[in-house]
Design a protein with these regions (language model features):
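Conserved, mostly hydrophobic/aromatic
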Residues: 15, 30, 47, 60, ...
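A short acidic, helix-capping loop that chelates divalent metal ions and anchors anionic groups
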Residues: 4-6, 67-74, 267-270
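Alpha-helix N-cap and loop-to-helix initiation/capping positions
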Residues: 7-14, 42, 46, 76-84, ...
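Aromatic-lined glycan-binding groove of carbohydrate-active enzymes
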Residues: 167-205, 240
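Terminal-tail/helix-coil boundary detector
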Residues: 205-236, 251, 255-256, 265, ...
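Active-site beta-loop-alpha junctions enriched in small/polar residues
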Residues: 1-3, 33-35, 63-67, 106-109, ...
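Glycine/proline-rich, positively charged
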Residues: 20, 70-166, 170, 181
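N-terminal binding-site loop/beta-alpha segment at the start of enzyme catalytic domains
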Residues: 1-58, 307
């Protein structure tokens, strides 16, 4: 996502180089979405161009589910009607330059379209050979079960990190019961868990951290204090706080796959190195003591919070 939106100006050439470097380092899963190109397909096109020489080595995941803003309208609305799903899938196939999508996610649950209809539309695409696996993003336990009854859900993608642990209560028990893999997005707390952070006021208006509650005065200082303690633990382990955060996720179970985003080849190599970091039971206990309930400040404004988390 961050290669074309949400974190300031994009650098297409740099993005392609980073993806190619990821392949060299053994990364096999790339995550994109219709939304990340704001209707232009730019993110999917970037991914498609980058992997053209090694497409068969990669698992390409993309998403449908939004009506994208037009003209001066900044608002995004949900749209998971079956006709729209088919339209987005065809666009994604073209943008990615591939004959199949490995994982097709519903980006957000659409309250106006029964989840059974969504699952049925994706099932048709799977039966046609255009999609291989069905995924959901930020879906609650009930929606997961209802969708699964129509078309088995292979993977759920939801925010999960040392900072955000709400999924541990009901979501992970549900996916584990059904044998669904879990992809953790924002595993580095949108960059907070890299220790390279600054207050919200120092980010530009096109950077989502400028309005993220965790960067706002009061919350920011408490989160920085927690990062300082995590950094001390990382130093004791001979690693970085970034690798510590990713290793923590990997330690939560073999079903957890974090997808850290980066534009930097150096950061990419650091992220991959987290697979070599082993955390002890005492290390995990200390992390729980430092941030027992996750970060200070909500991950989204109330209006944008997924329905399962709003209650």
């Amino acid at each position: 996502m961050g290669m074309t939106m949400a974190y300031g100006a994009a650098d297409e050439a740099g993005g392609i180089a980073t993806i190619k470097r990821a392949h060299d380092l053994g990364v096999t899963l790339l995550d994109t979405a219709e939304l990340y190109g704001n209707g232009t397909g730019s993110n999917e096109k970037l991914v498609g161009e980058a992997v053209a020489g090694f497409r068969d080595d990669m698992v390409l995941a993309t998403k449908f589910g939004f009506v994208l803003p037009r003209g001066s309208d900044p608002n995004r609305q949900l749209d998971s009607r079956p006709d729209r799903i088919r339209e987005v899938a065809e666009n994604s196939l073209r943008y990615l330059g591939t004959d199949h999508i490995d994982v097709l996610y519903q980006h957000r649950v659409d309250p106006d379209v029964p989840i059974e209809d969504v699952a049925g539309a994706v099932k048709e695409l799977i039966d046609a050979g255009k999609v291989r696996y069905f995924g959901l993003s930020e879906a609650g336990p009930d929606d997961i079960r209802r969708a699964y009854a129509v078309q088995p859900v292979s993977v759920l993608q939801t925010e999960y990190s040392i900072f955000e642990r709400a999924v541990e209560k009901e979501i992970l028990p549900t996916t584990r019961e059904l044998g669904i893999g879990f992809v953790a997005y924002s595993p580095l707390g949108r960059g907070f868990l890299t220790s390279q952070v600054k207050p919200a006021s120092e980010y530009g208006p096109d950077d989502m951290r400028s309005f993220d509650e965790r960067w706002q005065p009061g919350n920011y200082e408490q989160n920085v204090a927690a990062i300082e303690r995590l950094t001390e633990l990382a130093q004791q382990k001979g690693t970085s706080v970034t690798q510590l955060a990713l290793a923590w996720l990997l330690a939560q179970g073999d079903d957890i796959v974090p997808i850290p985003g980066t534009r930097s080849p150096d950061r990419l190599a650091e992220n991959v190195g987290a697979a070599d970091v082993t955390l002890t039971a005492d290390d995990l206990k200390l992390v729980d003591e430092i941030l027992p309930g996750g970060s200070f400040g909500s991950r989204y404004a109330e209006a944008n919070m997924p329905s399962w988390e709003r209650g």
